[in-house]
């Protein structure tokens, strides 16, 4: 309890938000997301240049996610009392190094090393994002600051693939990663200029990461996080075959649907701080319930293009509340161990993404076209019920 009080006293001492630092963190996160998904739009030229198949080249994305999962779990135990400012600078350096290694890769092995560097930065940065945010702004401003960071994520997710595809045709895939390295250098300088000293955890406050799961409501929260993200990836990973077959969209129509989804996600993220100020628990229970209903509507009436488009927009708008909401939950309910809680959260999300996509794919191949929707809807409904019944929430 003394640790919790000490942490909150430190937070209360922040009377004015450091928006420059918040935006530097948001920019760095956006760069990480863009670089994570660049290979998706550059697989063919990368594979041809390196003399490998597109399937093998695609493992560069898998390696990043795999390394990120483990990095998120162990980063806080590794860095311990190190000033977080230097740690964030290191992550920006790893981002830049990753881009350069990929750009100059003449073998698949070097490509994987470069992508592993990105995984270290990605997992570590995500694990620390909530705790960094709560140390840069006053407590009541944390949801707004988190919405800025996740808004940057939404923008990055929308532009990553089309930007990579366009620039790849224009300047070649290697120069695309060189340009990304230049963004990494900008991240380094912006962080050095704006991020204040953020001392690490004193030795007497060290606590085993997984002991946090013994606290009331924490295990339920992590299970809810797992189910909500698994439900998201069970649906979104297979949105192309579902929408093209069930609703009859062509490639151009699907592109517009995905763009609408991305814009709705950005709008939802932008509005999330206002909703979360009213009730974090209501948002975390209400959002998956709306998504469960959306999955049901799409399953029953998804052959209508207007209905299918409407569901995509509602889904993007609503799901945007979930990542911001759970990060806000950590900053409020686990404020004394926000870094360690963030580590577990990121690992759970990475595992959920993998499981959701894998099980959704199995269901699609072996049960039927709408089975990923039913799986997603079921997981979202269970999430809403679990949050309502078991997840504990501290007031700000």
Swiss-Prot record:
The chain crosses the membrane at residues 22-42, 55-75, 86-106, 108-128, 148-168, 176-196, 216-236, 256-276, 282-302, 306-326, 344-364, 367-387. Residues 43-54, 107, 169-175, 237-255, 303-305, 365-366 are periplasmic. GO terms for cellular component: plasma membrane. Residues 1-21, 76-85, 129-147, 197-215, 277-281, 327-343, 388-396 are cytoplasmic. GO terms for molecular function: antiporter activity; purine nucleoside transmembrane transporter activity. It catalyses: inosine(in) + H(+)(out) = inosine(out) + H(+)(in); guanosine(in) + H(+)(out) = guanosine(out) + H(+)(in). It is found in: Cell inner membrane. CDD domains: MFS_NepI_like. Belongs to the major facilitator superfamily. DHA1 family. NepI (TC 2.A.1.2.26) subfamily. This is Purine ribonucleoside efflux pump NepI. It comes from Escherichia coli O157:H7. The lineage of its organism: Bacteria, Pseudomonadati, Pseudomonadota, Gammaproteobacteria, Enterobacterales. The gene is nepI.
